[in-house]
């Protein structure tokens, strides 16, 4: 029972719009975050800059244009 519950929890957590999600997504747009040209994630992606909180647990991130790392050019 505990193993099934753990697997279900793992699948639910990995399907959330996280910055390092295995499914790949473009984030969630909240009005407060899109007003400052950002997207909401559960942690910022590589090459994105943290701006503010979207709500209690999500972070508003914006793509970094000043210090672009070579690893992030393909993202």
Curated annotation (Swiss-Prot):
Which GO CC terms are listed, alphabetically?
A: extracellular region
Is Disulfide bond there in the keyword field? Answer: yes
Q: Which cysteines are joined by disulfide bonds?
A: 33-60, 40-54, 44-61
Q: Name one Pfam family in it.
A: DEFB136
Q: Which residues belong to the signal peptide in this entry? A: 1-21
What is the first-listed, main subcellular location in coarse terms?
A: secreted
Q: Which domain of life is it from?
A: Eukaryota
MF terms (GO), sorted A to Z: lipopolysaccharide binding
One biological process term from GO is: defense response to Gram-positive bacterium
Q: What does this protein do?
A: Has bactericidal activity. May play a role in the antimicrobial protection of sperm and urogenital tract epithelia.
Similarity remark: Belongs to the beta-defensin family.
* Protein name per UniProt: Beta-defensin 42
* Organism encoding this protein: Mus musculus
Gene that codes for this?
Defb42
């Amino acid at each position: 029972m505990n193993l099934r519950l753990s697997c279900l929890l793992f699948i639910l957590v990995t399907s959330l719009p996280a910055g390092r999600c295995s499914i790949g997504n473009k984030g969630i747009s909240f009005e407060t975050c899109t007003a400052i040209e950002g997207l909401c994630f559960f942690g910022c992606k590589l090459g994105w800059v943290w701006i503010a909180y979207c709500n209690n647990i999500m972070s508003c991130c914006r793509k970094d244009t000043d210090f672009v790392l070579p690893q992030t050019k393909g993202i």
